[in-house]
Amino acid sequence: MAMKAVCVLKGDGPVQGTINFEQKESNGPVKVWGSITGLAEGLHGFHVHQFGDNTQGCTSAGPHFNPLSRKHGGPEDEERHVGDLGNVTAGKDGVAKVSIEDSVISLSGDHSIIGRTLVVHEKADDLGKGGNEESKKTGNAGGRLACGVIGIAQ
């Protein structure tokens, strides 16, 4: 049975969006789609963070969701956090159209992202290839522009 989830992204500034998730089989890939507006043109890190806690804005969401205790990487890398979804790309109009399929995140089980926070970052994610310690943790993606808790959808 297909599972669906949704996340409404909001922040302190103009960045906002809605991201949808669908997983047709419990061990199958998750389709991720939607749009984010109010971004500066270019690449922005896009990650699922550990906690569904937004009591102190996006900072209380904690680090990237990483149940396997791995180093940060890109979505195509073997060595990555479960929550590492790479980058979204905003055009001149400040809109990022998101269309991703990921086989590491899940909407159920040990890698479930339900109840965790999705974050869009200020800068590009270097996918763990930046050559410093921060790159291996966060991809040097910078501040958290907007976030929201991922919830079950109809």
From Swiss-Prot:
GO terms for MF: copper ion binding; protein phosphatase 2B binding; protein-folding chaperone binding; superoxide dismutase activity; zinc ion binding
Record's function text: Destroys radicals which are normally produced within the cells and which are toxic to biological systems.
GO cellular component labels: cytoplasm; cytoplasmic vesicle; cytosol; dendrite cytoplasm; mitochondrion; neuronal cell body; nucleus; protein-containing complex
Name of the protein in its database record: Superoxide dismutase [Cu-Zn]
Catalytic activity as recorded in UniProt: 2 superoxide + 2 H(+) = H2O2 + O2
Cited PROSITE patterns: SOD_CU_ZN_1, SOD_CU_ZN_2
Positions contributing to Cu cation binding: 47, 49, 64, 121
Disulfide bonds: 58-147
Cofactor: Cu cation; Zn(2+)
Keywords from the UniProt entry: Acetylation, Antioxidant, Copper, Cytoplasm, Disulfide bond, Lipoprotein, Metal-binding, Nucleus, Oxidoreductase, Palmitate, Phosphoprotein, Zinc
Lineage: Eukaryota, Metazoa, Chordata, Craniata, Vertebrata
Lipid attachment points (S-palmitoyl cysteine): 7
N-acetylalanine modification, residue list: 2
Signal peptide: none
Post-translational changes noted in the entry: Palmitoylation helps nuclear targeting and decreases catalytic activity. Succinylation, adjacent to copper catalytic site, probably inhibits activity. Desuccinylation by SIRT5 enhances activity.
Domain of life, source organism: Eukaryota
Family classification: Belongs to the Cu-Zn superoxide dismutase family.
